[in-house]
């Protein structure tokens, strides 16, 4: 197991480091997310990642699209692994989301898109499961801290079932 740290840069670096050192062909990401769509304490498998904070719309690009990066799409799709979990679209950004994101998604995190992009570039399968800690609202920072330990326990149980 490896801890990526918080944010897209930390996640991208750790994913690259782990893949380079281990030569793995699949990376399993277990983390937390906020959602106004899914219930708190629910496990959700991410089947698509988008960037909720990439905004170069002033230059004519859609929100979520990285300019001059035609090789990799704004949305990165993942093949589901866990048949018994709800599936969701995760908007990743380097901010703690407390409002409605500008891109279509039903959960939010701070690392997933970066992991997905590194995995896609290196031809590594990514499986990502998020524990919903909060409602991605004004109380999110309080709920996240309160629910972090519960999430770790539930994610560990899922990991041990594999």
What do these predicted regions represent?
Residues 1-162:
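Glycine-rich phosphate- or other oxyanion-binding loops that anchor nucleotides, phosphorylated ligands
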